[in-house]
C-alpha cells in the first residue's frame, strides 16, 4: 500500500496489479485484486495477466468480472498463448457483456501484429528498437497489415535474442549502447556479461538488420 500510494502521490496516473501466486479459483483471484485496489482507494488500475510469472490463469470471463469495477481501465496481456483471450474479451465488449477496456500486449513484442489484429490497442514492453513497435502499430491502424508484418519480421531475430532468460537485458543494453542511446552496456552485479561469441552473434544480427533497411546504427 505504501509503495502504491507513494507513487500516486508523486503523480502516477494509476497502478498495476497482478494476482499473488498460490491463489486458487476465480473468486479468490478476483477477491485479491479488489482488496489490493481497495487499499489505495479510487485510483485507476491495470490488471497484469502474466501467468508465466504468477502461475495464475486469468480467463476472459474473469477479466469481464473485474471490469465491472470502473477502476479497471486496462489489461496488460501477457498470457502465452493468449490471442484467443483477446478476441473473447473484445467479443464480450461488442455484445455489451462488459465495458470496453484498453489492452496492451507484452512478452517482448513477439506477437505484436497478431495482438493488434485481435483488438489490442498497443504494447507495453521492452525492446531495443521501440520505434519499430510504434511503426507497426501505426501501419496496422492504417490497414497496412502486410507492411506492418514486413517491418516486424526484420526484427524477429533480435526480438528472439532479447527474450533469452538471463541474457536478455544484457543483450538489450548492448544494442542500446551500439545505437548510442546509453553510454555503457554493463549490468549491475550479479547481472551477466556477454561472451565474445554472443556479442559477435548480436553484432551480426545488427549488421543484417541495417543492411536490410530495418535500422540505422552510428
Identify the residue ranges that each predicted region occupies.
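Short secondary-structure transition/capping segments
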Residues: 2, 27-31, 87-88, 135-138, ...
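Alpha-helix C-cap/termination motif
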Residues: 10, 39-40, 69, 92-96, ...
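Conserved beta-strand edge residues that scaffold enzyme active sites
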Residues: 21-22, 81, 129, 190
Amino acid at each position: 500500500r505504501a509503495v502504491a500510494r507513494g507513487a500516486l502521490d508523486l503523480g502516477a496516473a494509476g497502478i498495476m496489479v497482478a494476482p499473488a501466486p498460490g491463489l486458487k479459483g476465480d473468486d479468490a483471484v478476483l477477491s485479491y485484486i479488489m482488496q489490493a485496489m481497495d487499499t489505495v482507494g479510487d485510483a485507476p488500475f491495470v490488471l497484469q495477466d502474466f501467468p508465466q510469472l504468477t502461475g495464475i490463469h486469468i480467463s476472459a470471463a474473469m477479466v469481464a468480472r473485474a471490469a465491472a469495477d470502473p477502476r479497471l481501465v486496462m489489461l496488460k496481456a501477457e498470457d502465452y498463448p493468449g490471442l484467443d483471450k483477446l478476441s473473447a474479451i473484445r467479443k464480450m465488449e461488442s455484445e455489451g457483456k462488459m465495458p470496453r477496456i484498453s489492452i496492451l500486449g507484452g512478452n517482448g513484442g513477439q506477437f505484436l501484429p497478431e495482438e493488434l489484429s485481435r483488438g489490442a490497442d498497443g504494447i507495453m514492453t521492452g525492446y531495443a528498437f521501440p520505434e519499430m513497435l510504434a511503426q507497426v502499430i501505426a501501419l496496422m491502424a492504417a490497414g497496412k497489415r502486410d507492411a506492418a508484418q514486413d517491418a516486424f519480421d526484420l526484427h524477429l531475430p533480435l526480438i528472439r535474442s532479447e527474450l533469452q532468460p538471463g541474457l536478455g537485458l544484457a543483450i538489450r543494453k548492448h544494442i542500446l549502447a551500439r545505437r548510442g542511446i546509453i553510454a555503457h552496456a554493463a549490468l549491475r552485479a550479479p547481472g551477466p556479461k556477454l561472451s565474445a561469441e554472443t556479442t559477435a552473434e548480436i553484432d551480426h544480427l545488427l549488421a543484417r538488420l541495417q543492411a536490410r533497411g530495418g535500422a540505422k546504427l552510428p
